[in-house]
């Protein structure tokens, strides 16, 4: 602190007092270029002075302007101002070599240079001919600047840049040089991405993560490319609101279609690259090798575990096998013994049957009349078929140890017992069939005059007609009805409707009832046609030594086997019917011959019925 010097001796000190006003508060705001620079530095987070940054920016832009060399567009003066939309705006301004990379400052500078050179006033002063109004080519320069100076319009034009290569390399082109072919294509198309930092294609040494990021980016590519520049209609030219809406709707649909085609192009590009990428193949092979190694390791561990289990299982199986073989051997021995016994019994029955035939033959079948002899032969065959071994032995002992009269009496007694047994079986079957028929008629509820009074003969005739005229016959049910009306002895006229109703009711019968009806029909047929044997032209009549004929109806499979055997063994084949019988299991030679005769008669009857129906239809016409 500075103090005044003390006064000299003898001198006084003069003190002056003055009054001062009170302090006042003032609001002062910072202004000036330095404060402006401070604020801009703070906002831009820059340490250098704002003026230095602005100077550097201006210097860089000026250097760019100095370096920018405009290209002369040779076709400029030949452009049609009315067709300005189809011109290359960058080429018009001399920026064809820079294109979408040109800055706004460069566009402005290029336009300024073009104006100084091609303005109508300049050219007019130089003595060049000019066109009036918008017909001069200078209009193309103005339109180009309008399009490129507006960011929205420029983006629309960049989307349809005529110099952009939209081609997609094929798989064959990139077979040997994948990276050289696809790298520039992806680099070229990356300009359409909304996202920055577009991943590169990379090279053969790229990691799996980098390749996965690359393809994930391009498979989910977000493009800003739009096609409004190609709109055929301009809504500004619309005369009313409805027309403007219609134009907007048409333009939106066209843009959407072009956008879809663009995304399909990008997808095709990515698909082709993915399918040709050698790294993908390498990664798949590595993954496959890894899985194979893991699989082999698991298989090896499982194999060792299975070996231990297999040893234990083999021991158990061996013990079980030995026990099973022992059991099977016992069963086989028992079956062999049973088969031997059965064969012995068959041989014994066959021997006794032959013995019975020979005994009867020795006594000339106990008759001097040919018809009675044939009938006795049939009865003997019936005995051979139905008698058991003990009964056959007893009967043979009687025949060999007695006189002719006693033997005949014993034989007739045995025949009477068998016939009585057969008669009882038939009566039971007929009663069962009648009861079933009554139940069926009650359940059917009647079907006209023809649905009542169906006799047993009519039922048998209906079954025969249904089998005679199978499905597929023309006017089948009319033919069946006509056949029944011709051959029926009841005198009742049946219609096709009556026949259909009765056939449906018979179909509801159980298999045993159907078999009984079929047997009934066969017995009736035999009674009518089997009394006097008829000679077959295909083979001579002969005595049958086989077992008694079975009356079981022929199945479809047996019918097919019989037809095939008839084709296989023609008429001139020696022992034809023996071979045919061998081809049809379960049927004897006599069965096959009788079935053949039945089929011949059925075919003849079928042809006659069809001929009658045909004649009736012709008569109606």
From Swiss-Prot:
Keywords: Acetylation, Activator, Chaperone, Chromatin regulator, Cytoplasm, Nucleus, Phosphoprotein, Repeat, Transcription, Transcription regulation. The ZRF1-UBD region specifically recognizes and binds H2AK119ub. The ZRF1-UBD region is also involved in protein-protein interactions with other proteins, suggesting that it may be masked by some regulator, thereby preventing its association with H2AK119ub. It holds the Pfam family RAC_head. It is found in: Nucleus; Cytoplasm, Cytosol. One of its GO terms (cellular component) is nucleolus. It comes from Macaca fascicularis. The modification N-acetylmethionine is found at residue 1. Residues 294-315, 427-453 are annotated as: Disordered. This is DnaJ homolog subfamily C member 2. GO terms for molecular function: chromatin binding; histone binding; Hsp70 protein binding; ribosome binding; ubiquitin-modified histone reader activity. Component of ribosome-associated complex (RAC), a heterodimer composed of Hsp70/DnaK-type chaperone HSPA14 and Hsp40/DnaJ-type chaperone DNAJC2. Interacts (via ZRF1-UBD region) with ID1. Phosphorylated in M (mitotic) phase. Disulfide bonds: none annotated. The lineage of its organism: Eukaryota, Metazoa, Chordata, Craniata, Vertebrata. Residues 88-161 form the J domain. The modification Phosphoserine is found at residues 47, 49, 60, 63, 183. Signal peptide: none annotated. Residues 160-250 are annotated as: ZRF1-UBD. Acts both as a chaperone in the cytosol and as a chromatin regulator in the nucleus. When cytosolic, acts as a molecular chaperone: component of the ribosome-associated complex (RAC), a complex involved in folding or maintaining nascent polypeptides in a folding-competent state. In the RAC complex, stimulates the ATPase activity of the ribosome-associated pool of Hsp70-type chaperones HSPA14 that bind to the nascent polypeptide chain. Residues 449-511, 549-604 form the SANT domain. GO terms for biological process: 'de novo' cotranslational protein folding; DNA replication; negative regulation of DNA biosynthetic process; positive regulation of DNA-templated transcription; regulation of translational fidelity.
